[in-house]
Design a protein with these regions (language model features):
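Alpha/beta-hydrolase superfamily serine-hydrolase fold, recognizing
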Residues: 17-307
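Bacterial N-terminal signal peptides
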Residues: 7-15
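Bacterial N-terminal signal peptides that target proteins for export
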Residues: 1-6
């Protein structure tokens, strides 16, 4: 009996190992990302991943563009849903990055960040891809306020697209992760109800007191509050009951790695560890540009978490 158990365990381990390469970054792509290094370089990283992404029109997916959740031109969102009729499907909302001063849900001729929505829709979910107002014209806490307005739109209207407003996962990357974290951490943004079931924070910043002196992007968005606890989400994240996933790349700039570990350790110290996702070989941009390719390093855990 013992021998049979050992053989079965070995077979399971071998099967798990065999499936791992399909989930991870291919070696040729890994070499290109590594050559860019621990810097934030969207154009060079996009040149690696854009050829791997599908082009419009997207088969099997229904896309509704530029729905308004507020009066500003940047208060807009796209909804992706499976072409087949769905109801009460889980919802994945995505908030892009851009150093608080740039970025969009979608660029002309670019597959990003449609790729994240396609991964959601092709896995039976409804995707919501939002953009928001930018610094320096719009300072803290505008980003979190816009996230809150978009969440309210989802609560009001997502059923018409087949989504379940009770099963919303809110995902942010880089500056978008800061806005998502701020929305979750500061109750003033969700006094009528938080409107999400869980949150995913990919390469975000949570304790700005550790980032001194503040960088130009932080100064542009936070103004005189840059570098203070007042704009840091850490304390609020330690109090929230929202389940969290925290992700970061091996080749992320050091401050993002440090902040992910800081948040993870602080939550674990309270006995409520987040789902921590370490992305071997990935950089700040490759981690999100790889979504909807054969590399499921990030998309696999996120889609599982969001169901």
């Amino acid at each position: 009996m013992t021998r049979r158990l050992l053989v079965a365990a070995a077979a399971l381990a071998l099967a798990a190992c065999a499936s791992t390469p399909q989930m991870q970054m291919p070696p040729d792509i890994a070499a290109k990302v590594k050559a860019i290094g621990p810097v934030i370089d969207p154009p060079k990283t996009a040149a690696i991943y854009a050829p791997l992404q599908p082009k419009e029109p997207y088969a099997g997916v229904r896309v509704t563009r530029d729905l308004r959740y507020g009066p500003d031109p940047r208060q807009a969102l796209d909804v992706f849903a499976p072409d087949r009729v769905v109801s009460n499907a889980p919802v994945l909302m995505f908030v892009h990055g851009g150093a608080f001063v740039a970025g969009n849900k979608r660029g002309p001729g670019s597959p990003f960040y449609d790729n994240i929505m396609l991964a959601a829709a092709r896995n039976g979910m409804v995707g919501v891809n939002m953009t928001y107002r930018l610094a320096p014209q719009h300072k803290w806490p505008t980003g979190a306020a816009d996230v809150g307005a978009a969440v309210k739109w989802v609560q009001d209207y997502i059923r018409a697209h087949g989504g379940d407003p009770a099963r919303v996962t809110l995902m942010g990357h880089s500056a978008g992760a800061v806005h998502v974290a701020s929305y979750v951490a500061f109750p003033e943004h969700h006094r009528a109800g938080i409107g999400i079931a869980r949150a995913v924070l990919v390469s975000g910043l949570f304790d700005f007191t550790k980032l001194t002196p503040p960088g130009k992007p932080e100064a542009a968005y936070f103004g005189g509050l840059a570098g203070t606890a007042q704009v840091s989400s850490l304390a609020g994240l330690l109090k929230t009951s929202v389940p969290l996933m925290v992700a970061y790349g091996e080749i992320d700039p050091p401050m993002f790695i440090e902040q992910a570990k800081l948040l993870n350790e602080a939550l674990c110290a309270q006995g409520r560890c987040p789902r921590l996702v370490y992305l071997p070989g990935h950089s700040h941009m490759s981690e999100v540009y790889a979504v909807n390719t054969d590399d499921r390093s990030l998309s696999g855990p996120v889609l599982e978490f969001a169901r």
